[in-house]
């Protein structure tokens, strides 16, 4: 079975590609027995499943082949980012992912809906030459599984804000290779 969700206690700094910088650091702090609220990470494996959606891939392929991001065509980049965001926001989270998120959220509150923070953890976030501070979204005081699932979807979509796409473009990063954990 694929690891769509991992508890903080299972995370460490060697897992950047799977959980991103923020979650990897939360895992390190948890394992050092420092006071960290209990939590879990929705891994990049889950994002990748969403991102392999045929329509989403079609959008990315059209823009990649048009070389919009090599040419610095701001309008084409903006159009691409908006199309990807809308597709992610309209997507239904596959049952196999929603079920494990639901289970992990249920464990946090012992079956009761509790407020949680839903935060993005990008795989490119902690590159030594780039500060991605504030590029992806965070949602605080989220209560109930439907709200949690919606916040996860909105975090995934925030990978494709105009600002985030332009920033990656300015660093020469491959737009299609960026992944997001939550």
Explain the meaning of each model-derived region.
Residues 1-181:
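N-terminal beta-alpha lobe that positions the nucleotide/phosphoryl donor
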């Amino acid at each position: 079975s694929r690891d769509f969700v991992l508890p903080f206690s299972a995370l460490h700094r060697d897992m950047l590609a799977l959980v991103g910088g923020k979650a990897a650091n939360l895992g390190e702090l948890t394992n050092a027995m420092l006071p960290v609220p209990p939590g879990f990470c929705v891994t990049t494996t889950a994002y990748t499943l969403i991102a392999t959606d045929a329509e989403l891939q079609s959008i990315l392929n059209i823009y990649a082949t048009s070389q919009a991001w090599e040419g610095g065509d701001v309008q084409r980049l903006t159009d691409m980012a908006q199309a990807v965001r809308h597709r992610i926001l309209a997507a239904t989270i596959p049952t196999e992912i929603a079920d494990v998120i639901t289970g992990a959220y249920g464990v946090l509150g012992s079956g009761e809906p509790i407020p949680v923070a839903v935060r993005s953890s990008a795989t490119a976030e902690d590159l030594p030459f780039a500060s991605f501070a504030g590029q992806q979204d965070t949602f605080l005081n989220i209560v109930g599984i439907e709200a949690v699932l919606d916040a996860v979807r909105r975090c995934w979509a925030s990978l494709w804000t105009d600002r985030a796409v332009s920033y990656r473009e300015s660093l020469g990063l491959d737009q299609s290779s960026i992944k997001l954990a939550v």
